[in-house]
Amino acid sequence: MTEGFLSVRQHLALQEMGVDVWVRRPHEPATRVTRDSRVPHAEGNSGSANSADALLALNKQILTCTACELHKTRTQAVCGVGTLSADVLVIGEAPGADEDKQGEPFVGRAGQLLNEMLRAVGRSREQVFIANILKCRPPQNRDPRSEEVEQCLPFLRAQIELLQPRLIVVVGRIAAHNLLGVETPLGQLRGRVHYFGDSRIPVVVTYHPAYLLRSPAQKSKSWQDLLLVMDVLSAANTTDGQDGRDPKVHERQA
């Protein structure tokens, strides 16, 4: 998908983000993106009752988890929000104060900007699934500690296994480092496609909406990341199921 084919709704979303749309330089088209044929297709995208029951059971475990000290200071755990049929999974760092109160990830101003970012790639909040590395808010919004991440990551991995999304969009340095198991600077993680797990789910890294609110000049770079998101989704939608080759997508200039 190029800028010339953006819908009116997507242009409006970009205006809300404060991003000017320009014509992209010609580039080599994306190659095929397919699910790894060696990995059984999870039931999450079928919308089956079994998957819904499994997600409810997982949410119950999250809500009652006392594996780390964060359960003592939380108002509630924040499991995640979205549909089992989501082709896009958005992963952030941890709940903030608003999320801790409301029990839903990405609310407030950062959530509003995330909604506009989703609209820019042709998705509504209701069409995706949104989760965090940590399910409980760290006090004073401090960075997650390694022992907290260690206890929480199995929940996120279980969510990914249930959903089997076509694409994971990771927002922010901490989320990217913990999901991908790297310490590479965020700027070097952007502009290319990473892969998660044995099923090699494509992963695109971009800035956290809260950071973009503080640094609006970086929104143009975030738009480049969203173009890469659209490339991956477009390739997946046009070639899904045609072969079992490993997914590969061209890198984009960050």
Language model segments and positions:
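A polyanion-binding, active-site-adjacent surface
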Residues: T2-A254
